[in-house]
C-alpha cells in the first residue's frame, strides 16, 4: 500500500515536471488574453488619487504555489506586468479613507512564489518627504493608455516596477519608490495536489514591496537610488548602494538582478528615474484684459531634455477653489503646460493648486492664492439739470457696485458735445459736475461712465442725457459797410454775427446826427437804404442784432452826405476845361524832351563806338576744380575783382544800331526808354494789314551755350503790348515762358497780368485765345498750364507752360542761389528739343532775365566742358541785348550759383524715385568707401560761427542760455520790445534783415530764439530753447508779439534730476507783467498732449488763442522712438495754423509756429526739417533733404548734427510715401513707420553741440569753406565736411 502510494505520488510529480509548471526560473508563455503591455510609471504624489479599473482588469488574481493564497494589490502597490488596458471609458473607485486603489492582473512568474503581504500604505518618510501611492489619478483628462517607461522582463526571474514619491531637500530631491509584490497566474489545469516545498522566502516576495528612494543631486543633475528596508541587498555581485548611483533623469534601468542572503532565487526589477523637480517653475500667464474673470498659470521648464523625458508623460493640472469651496478644474489642451480658468468672479480670492504629473503621478505641487481683478462698475444715471445759457449742472446718484465688483468706481468720465466732443475725468467722490463754456441756444448731449483702475482701466457702460442751453446776448454784426448811392442817401449793409445765440434774426439800424435821434429801422436782413438826408451832414449809423430774446451791442459807422451836385456843375465844368489845357501842355513838353533825348543818345553812341571793345578785359575761363578758390579770391576785399570785371563790360554796344525801337509808332511799346533791342537780332512779328509798327516787340534773340537763339529775352508786357506778346509766343512756337518778376513790386507796376485767371478760364488776345488748364502755387514759383490757339488757323492749340518766379526780392538778389538752380530744374523739365525758344522776361528784360539765362547757359558749359567763362558769356549777352546782367550783384550771383552746383550737385529727389534712389545711395561700392548718402552728408557745410553772436554772448545775457554752444545769430535772433506800441499791433516790417538790425535795437530784450524760414516763404518759424524759470515771462511776451499760434514742445520738464525746461504754464490764470495766460483746456492723445491757452494783454482788447503740442514719446533721445506719432502730431497741428499767404514781405517778423526742446538745437532742428520736407512732398512731390538741412544750419547752431538724424529724414519720408507698382502711394500718417539704420555708429559733425561747455580743438579744426554770400556780408560762411563718416558697412536692404 505504501509502495503504491509512493508510486502514485512519484507519477504525479513527473506529470507536473512535464507541464513545466514547477521549473524554477521559467515563465510559461502568456496567452493572448493575458499578454503583458507597457505600464505607466506612477510618480510621487502628496495626495492619493482615485484608481482606475477597467472591464478587463479583475479586482484580484489567485496563484498556485505555497499555500495557494490569493493576493490583492493595495494602494501604493503597482505590478510590473500589466494586462493590456482597454481604451473604453474608465471607472473610478475611491478607496476607503480617501485613498484611491487600482487593481491590476498579471501572469504569474512562478506558481510556487508566495506574494508579499499587503504594502498598500505609504511608508513613513522624513520631514518634507512626500510618499505617493502608486495609483493612476482619476482624472478623465488623462488617458489610461499612457505609454509606459517599463516593460516586463523576459529573464527567468520575474520583473518588478517601482512606485515613486518625492522629497525636497536642500541638496537635491529625494524620490521614494515602493515595488509591487509578485503576482501569480492561475493555472488553467484543474488543481490536483498542491506541494509546498519552499523552505526559504522568495526574492520576488521580498522585493515586491520594496521602497526605493531617489535622491536628486542638483550639482551634477543625477539621482541616487536607495532600496529601503532591505539589508545587504545585492545588485548582481555588488552592493546595491555602490551600483545605483549617478542615474540620469528620465532614464530607464531594466532587469536589475537583486538578491539577498535571506531569499532565493534572485529576481529582477526595473527602475524609472523621474525628471528633476528644479526643472519646473510656475508663472502667472493671465492677460491683464481678462484678469477680472480668468486665472492662468503656466509651468515653464528649464534645461529639461525632452529627448529623454517624453513630454507626453508630463501632465499639468490646475485646481482653484474660491471661498465658497466650489471646485473648478480646467486643462488647456492646446498649450499643455498652461492651464487657464475662465468665467470666474471678479475681485475674488481663489486658492489654486498647480500640479505636475509624471506618468499620471504627482511630481510637483504648488499652492498659491490668487485674487481676480476689479470688475466693471455699474453704469451711473446722469441727469441734466435746468441749463443756463453757457453752463449746466449734471448730477448722478452714486452707483452701487455689481456683485462681481467689490469696490466702488475709481472715477468718472463725463463727455459733452455739440459739434465737437470734450471730455473731463472726474474723481469718484463727486456726484455732480458743472459743465461750463457752453454756447448759448445749442443742443448738447452728455454721456457719463464710471471706471475702475485695476491692472488696467475698466470702463463701464456710458449713459446719456440731453439738454438745450438758453439764449444769450448775440455777438456784434460783422463787416458793416456804408456807401452813398446818391448825394443825400446812405446804404448800410453788414453780415450776421458769429454767434446769434437765440431763435430769431432781426437787425436794428438807428440813425443819429449831432447826438440826436433821426430814425430807426427793423429788418430780417442787414440791408438798409436811408434816403432824404440832409446834404453835407455827418450821420452816425448804429447797427445791432436782436435774436428774439436779447439785443447785442451796436456797431457804429460815421458817414457824411455829399454836397448838392447841381450847385457845383458850373465850377466843375470850368475846372475840367482848365485841367485839360494844362494836361495838353504837359504832354507836349514830355514829347519834346523825349525827342531831344533820343537824338542826344544817338550822338553819344557814335562818340563811344570805337571804345567799346578796347575796355574789355582778358579774363580766363575757370575750371571746375578751382571754381570755389577763384570765387573766394575775387569776392575778397569787398568783391574788388568782380567789380573791375563787371565795370569793364560796356552797358550798350554802340556798333549795333537801335533804330526800329526808336520809331515814333514803336516808342509807346517800350517800358523803359533806355532799354531797347538791337535791330539785328530783335524778334520780328508778322505784319498786320500793312502796319509797319505791327512787326515790333521789345524782345531779342539770345544764344545759349553753343545753341543759337535758344532764348528770347523780352520786357514784361505792358497793357498795350499783351496782344503782341501772345502773337510772338504763337509765331515763335514757344512752349515755356519764364517770368522772373511779380506784377507789382514795391507799389510799382512791373508787368501786366497777361494770362487769364482760373475763375476767368479763357481770354482772347485778338486772334490768340489763351485758356488756363492748371494753376499750381509753390513757395518760390507758380506753374500754370496754358493752351494757346489761333482763331484763323485750323491747327490744334499748343500747350504752353508759364513759370513765374516769385522769390526775387524787390531790392538786390535772392539770398540763396539754390533757388535759381531749383527754378532751372523746373524749366528744363518742361522744355524739349523740338519746342521753340524759351521766353524769359522780367520787367525790363535785361537784369533778372540776363542772370537766369547766364546761370542756365554756364551750367550747361560746366557739365559739358568742366569749365565756365562767365565774363565772356556776359559780354556775349550784352552784344545781343543791352544791359543784360544789369548790376554787379547779379554778376556775382551767377558765380555763386555755379559754385553751389559744383560743390553740392543735384540733391533733389522725386517721390516716385525716392525708394530706388535711397536704396542706391545706401550702397557702398567698394565696401570700404562711404556710401553716396554718407558722402552727401559729409558735403554739408557746418556754418559754425559763420555770423556774429554778440548779443547772446553779452555778460548779462549768458545766464539766459541753457547751452553756451547754442546761441542765436544776431542777424536772425528774435528781439523782444520792452513796451508795445499802442498805435500798432505789430512792429514795422523791413525789406531786409541784416546783422546790424538786432544790434541797433537798444530797446529790445534778449531771448534765446531764432527765426527759421519755413517751407511757405515768407512765413517763418521760431526755434527756441526751453524757457528758464526767470525767462518764462519773456517767453510768453515773444509768443504774443510774434503772433505765435502753435507751440511745439519736444522735451520733458526734467531729465533725471536735471531740469531741461521750466513749466511755463499752470492751472488757472498766470500773470507776467502786462500779459495774462490762462490754460483753457487739456487733451491727451497717445503720443502728445494738446493744451489750449488764452492770452490777454492789458493794452489789447481781443484775446488770442495759442495751442501747445507736447510730444510725450520723444524722451530726449537723438531720434524719436515712434516716428509715426511725430508725423501724426505734425498733421494735426497743421490744422491749427493759418493759411499760408501767397504774397508777402520777404523778411517778415511774425511766426505762426514756435518749436523748442531743451536748448533749441537737435530735436528742434530735426522737427523743423521734417516739417518742411513733409510740406514739400505734399505740395511738389519732391524732397531735398540736403538743402533743407543746409538752410536750417545757417539759421541756428547745432541742428541735424549727426548722420543718423540725416538718414532718419530720408527714411521717414520714404516710409510715409511707400512705392507701389512704381508709383508713390501716400499712406495714412498713422501707419507704422520702421527704420533701418545703415550705419552702426555715425559720428557727429562739427556742427553738433554738447550739453554745455566750449567746443574742443577737434571741433574747431573741422571748419571748412563756406557757401558763397553776397558782397555785403560782413563775414564769409564756412563749408565743412561733416567729419569722416566711415562706419562699418552694413547689408543693404
Curated annotation (Swiss-Prot):
Glycans are attached at residues 66, 152, 163, 209, 213, 220, 255, 260, 292, 313, 324, 349, 418, 429, 459, 491. The modification Phosphoserine is found at residues 964, 983, 986, 990, 993-994, 998, 1229, 1286. GO terms for molecular function: ankyrin binding; heparan sulfate proteoglycan binding; heparin binding; protein kinase binding; protein tyrosine kinase inhibitor activity; protein tyrosine phosphatase activity; signaling receptor binding; spectrin binding. The chain crosses the membrane at residues 567-588. Residues 642-901, 933-1216 form the Tyrosine-protein phosphatase domain. Residues 376-472, 473-568 form the Fibronectin type-III domain. Residues 26-566 are extracellular. The keyword Transcription does not apply. It is an enzyme of class 3 (hydrolase). Interacts with SKAP1. Interacts with DPP4; the interaction is enhanced in an interleukin-12-dependent manner in activated lymphocytes. Binds GANAB and PRKCSH. Interacts with CD53; this interaction stabilizes PTPRC on the membrane and is required for optimal phosphatase activity. Interacts with CLEC10A. Protein tyrosine-protein phosphatase required for T-cell activation through the antigen receptor. Acts as a positive regulator of T-cell coactivation upon binding to DPP4. The first PTPase domain has enzymatic activity, while the second one seems to affect the substrate specificity of the first one. Upon T-cell activation, recruits and dephosphorylates SKAP1 and FYN. Dephosphorylates LYN, and thereby modulates LYN activity. This is Receptor-type tyrosine-protein phosphatase C. It comes from Mus musculus. The lineage of its organism: Eukaryota, Metazoa, Chordata, Craniata, Vertebrata. The gene is Ptprc.
